[in-house]
A protein has these predicted regions:
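Short coil-to-beta transitions that initiate beta-strands within beta-rich domains
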Residues: 25-48, 72-97, 109-116, 139-174, ...
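Glycine-centered tight-turn motifs at strand-turn-strand junctions
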Residues: 472, 490-520, 531-536
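C-terminal tail/sorting-segment detector
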Residues: 524-544
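Asp-box/BNR beta-propeller loop motif
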Residues: 24-32, 58-81, 119-140, 189-201, ...
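Terminal processing/anchoring signals of secreted or surface-associated proteins
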Residues: 443-444, 457-460, 472-474, 491, ...
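Glycine-centered coil/turn sites that cap beta-strands in beta-rich domains
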Residues: 446-485
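Bacterial N-terminal signal peptides
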Residues: 7-19
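Conserved beta-propeller blade signature
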Residues: 51-54, 103-105, 178-180, 189, ...
């Protein structure tokens, strides 16, 4: 699961630690039940059979038949690298085998400031997530200034800085011990010992369409440098090992393919690079941020790519999706003009999520149905239109969509209703999973993450361009009208909304505009929640 450009969101992720309020004692070693997601920004997903892993703090969703007790649908991994440090999960991969526990890999990142994500190492589990082993990052030592490729010893840039080298994507080979990480500026790296050590994988430079270890080269290995050296094709955002054992790597200069027959006796790989161009059989853009495989029973599995317009290479690059039905022999462009973040597939259906919502195709991308309104189960509400879809995955039981406002689940039996022309016209109903932080918590729930307040706003600080909306949470003893008002620092009214709300904990959203729809300036804002003759107050720090 790739996370290109997610550093901007990383620094804004509000992470809750449900269940840790009473954790004055050491954290347990095993998966522990939790009441909600760790964050409402869900950017990484990894299916594992019926179950689903999600970031940013390794939450596992279990279907009813797999739950330790009926109410325990969500479990949280108790990994100190996440619960006691500033790391979040930036890349996820879960590998399942019949009659064996899932193997789970998590690439970690932390904020290095200035909207930059930094490499934080890895977590690896071989027992279905019950326990995780911590692994160091995949970076170079200062003396790693050469790399052997075939008969050549190539000069290399030692990538020693954690910043801009956060794991973007993970792929695991069929043996379960070999893994590849798409490491942004650190390139493509390989581990053959479950992440205990990593080695650099040599990819073609921007000037070559293919390389082979049978030939000799002299190009420098490394990302672009300020003095002009380095290559965009050595900046890697996505990777995949498909059913045939072919390794794919999406970079800033196209898509790289290495088949099983391309591997030499020393493990060095021949590569072919595919790039963008105006021709129909080329990629829409050179920046490949996601790679997904479509399982088929009647043909070779197609490969789907989220391809973005890049800063180099051929002119006329576009955002969109590119697919190959035959392992790279030919390519086809679809969804041209759409900025797509993630892809998933189940049999004939392909799912893509992007800035404009969820896209579904059942005819290999010839036509698409777009879904940007998500009606919620058991409710008359839909997700706010400002919410962005960020990730997508399929399990054997459901379709999952990660958003900037929670995790959506749709029963597999309801997927057909997503398609235009479906015989059953009612729109499908989604289940929404979100972070659960109580208002007026009990004493044993109170902590730094769960303050004892009557109302709160999150995310706070609120960055409208990044967060899209802020939620003001409060609790009602009985159903009735609620008025939420926002004031500026001089206590001048900026915005107000009145709506009828049911009893219990509720939320009202604000998008950072005034009553005229104009964006408000950076500053401190105060809000009031008025209901049933009572008023509670709070504060929001807004920055543009």
């Amino acid at each position: 699961m790739t996370r290109l450009c997610s550093a901007v969101l990383l620094v804004g992720v509000l992470v809750f630690l449900p269940g840790l309020a009473v954790a004055q004692q050491p954290a347990p070693d095993r998966l522990a039940p939790t009441t909600g997601l760790a964050s409402n920004q869900v950017q990484v997903l990894a299916p594992a059979g019926d179950s689903l892993w999600s970031g940013p703090l390794l939450t596992l969703y279990l279907e009813p038949a797999d739950r330790p007790s009926p109410e325990d649908s969500l479990l949280a991994a108790q990994a100190p690298a996440l619960t006691e440090e500033d790391n979040v999960v930036f890349a996820l991969n879960a590998r399942t085998e019949p009659d064996a526990p899932a193997q789970v890999w998590a690439g970690l990142a932390f904020s290095a400031g200035q909207n930059t994500a930094a490499a934080g190492g890895f977590l690896v589990s071989t027992d279905g997530g019950e326990t995780f082993a911590r692994r160091a990052d995949h970076l170079d030592a200062p003396e790693d200034t050469t790399v052997t490729y075939g008969p050549a010893t190539l000069p290399a840039t030692a990538v020693v800085q954690e910043a801009n080298s956060a794991p973007q994507d993970l792929a695991v080979g069929p043996d379960g011990d070999t893994a590849w990480v798409a490491g942004n500026q650190s390139g493509l790296r390989r581990s053959v010992d479950q992440g205990r050590s990593w080695s650099r994988v040599v990819l073609p430079p921007d000037t070559l369409r293919s390389i082979t270890p049978d030939s000799s080269y002299s190009f420098r290995v490394g990302p672009p440098q300020s003095e002009g050296a380095g290559w965009r094709n050595h900046v890697v955002f996505s990777t995949l090992v498909d059913e045939t054992g072919t390794l794919w790597a999406g970079t800033g200069a196209g898509l790289n393919r290495s088949r099983p027959q391309d591997v030499g006796p020393q493990g060095e790989r021949a590569w072919q690079r595919f790039a963008a161009g105006p021709q129909p059989e080329r990629l829409t853009g050179n920046t490949v941020v996601a790679v997904a495989e479509q399982p088929r029973v009647d043909a070779r599995n197609p490969i789907w790519l989220a391809t973005w317009a890049g800063s180099g290479g051929a002119g006329g690059q576009r955002f969109g999706v590119t697919m190959t039905p035959n392992g790279g022999d030919t390519f086809r462009k679809v969804l041209v003009g759409e900025r797509i973040f993630d892809l998933a597939a189940r049999e004939a259906r392909v799912f893509a999520v992007g800035e404009q919502g969820l896209f579904v195709s059942e005819n290999q991308g010839q036509t698409w149905r777009s879904i940007n309104e998500f009606r919620l189960r058991g409710d008359t509400k839909t997700l706010p239109p400002e919410v962005t879809t960020r990730s997508v995955a399929v399990t054997s039981a459901a379709l999952w969509v990660g958003t900037t406002d929670g995790l959506l689940r749709l029963d597999r039996s309801q997927e057909a209703r997503l398609l235009s022309g479906a015989s059953d016209p009612p729109a499908p109903r989604w289940t929404l999973l979100r972070a659960q932080v109580p208002v007026n918590p009990s004493p044993d729930q109170t902590s730094e993450q769960v303050p004892d307040v009557e109302a709160y706003a999150y995310p706070n600080p609120f960055v409208p361009s990044r967060d899209q909306l802020v939620r003001i949470a409060y609790e009602l003893d009985s159903a009735g009208p609620v008025t939420v008002t926002v004031y500026d620092f001089g206590m001048n009214k900026v915005w107000s909304a009145t709506e009828n709300q049911p009893r219990g904990q509720q939320e009202t959203t604000w998008d950072g505009t005034d009553d005229r729809g104009l964006r408000v300036p950076t500053g401190t804002y105060f809000y009031t929640v008025e209901t049933g003759g009572q008023t509670v107050r709070g504060k929001i720090l807004l920055t543009n």
